[in-house]
């Protein structure tokens, strides 16, 4: 992922794909269409540009989304681990994100600390929509299963629906709450 600035001074994240993956274009179009109808501070506008990058006469797709300024959840945790008030605020913000996400007809599909950005004001935003499920994908198999450390160990490719975020939400929330009880868990297990 590259950070770039447009002519208006706005920052974007640009993800370049150097290999063709079957169904990627179709699925990203479905994701972009679904997310275009959602107004939420937890999501970033995203566009899939099918033939945007030219290398040696080959055309490659790119993904363009707004840049989320902040720190990944894991880096932010290491920064605030000694500040119980900041940790409680983070837990509260993650609960709110979780309640919102669980009420949606879609799922992120790869919830993990690296895909949650803590913005400078403490609010949270999700990034990396590769594994996302949207209703138009009903009946498809998962393109990816999410990170092993944060997915349901029983999850399979056929388990691809709006409920795939349930397990990682519980896992992350419990982990955050355990840090209130013992901040040393972060250095021991984190």
Model segments located where?
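ATP-binding glycine-rich loop module of kinase domains
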Residues: 1-44, 56
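Helical subdomain adjoining the active site within ATP-dependent kinase catalytic cores
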Residues: 178-190
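Conserved structural core of kinase catalytic domains
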Residues: 42-88, 139
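Catalytic-loop of the protein kinase fold
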Residues: 98, 102-119
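Conserved activation segment of eukaryotic-like protein kinases, specifically the C-terminal portion
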Residues: 140-154
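Conserved end of the kinase activation segment
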Residues: 154-163
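Activation of the activation-loop gatekeeper triad in protein kinase-fold domains
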Residues: 128-133
